[in-house]
């Protein structure tokens, strides 16, 4: 890994642009070392890692897919981002930190990279810390491999991150299916399918699933439709 550029925000964190390429082939990814606003990093440490070079989805509000899709990252390439951030913080210990969140949500769609699942298992082994929280953010693509991928993700959550130590986020962006299609321009689960999966996902003690929305200018969220589709017992 070669760091190409580092950008810092005082009191918040650092964004790294890294080249994972070999033999002259450039493979650029971003990852972030940060904290939750208003919470000291000593209490909550947040790492955001990439799962792909670029992204094949092309969401309207995201620039990760602007240069196209450059391939999936390996387990070692994903965990390498975590290890790099750990080395940059010698006064902090991933294994002893009271709360450290590793969010697979920077560049790429995690469910389109099969290596994300073994990376999650490897992370739990490498950082055996009850304060470790793993997180995935997804647009829920509709492909033949995604449904079994999510079922396996349930098993990873139950086996490696029980007791509320896993956070699953769905990037929906609209409660209107037609409008959502313009924001996330790929085939994907319908809203009712996301809701049904959420019911299967939840076990006692689990974190609620998070719904993310990024409406554009002049676009309004239909709160009533969201509440009608998504049970607040399972979603927030």
Model-derived segments and spans:
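Flexible, acidic/Gly-rich N-terminal and inter-domain linker regions that tether
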Residues: 1-45, 49, 57
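A structure-centric signal for secondary-structure junctions around beta-strands
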Residues: 13, 28, 43-44, 56, ...
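Amphipathic repeat-derived elements
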Residues: 18, 36-48, 78, 95-97, ...
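Short, flexible active-site-adjacent loop segments at beta-strand->alpha-helix junctions, enriched
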Residues: 22, 35-37, 53, 108, ...
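Surface-exposed beta-strand edges and their flanking turn/coil or helix-capping segments
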Residues: 32-33, 42-46, 62-64, 75-77, ...
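Canonical Radical SAM [4Fe-4S] cluster-binding loop centered on the CxxxCxxC motif
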Residues: 35-87
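Conserved AdoMet/S-adenosylmethionine-binding subsite of the radical SAM
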Residues: 86-236
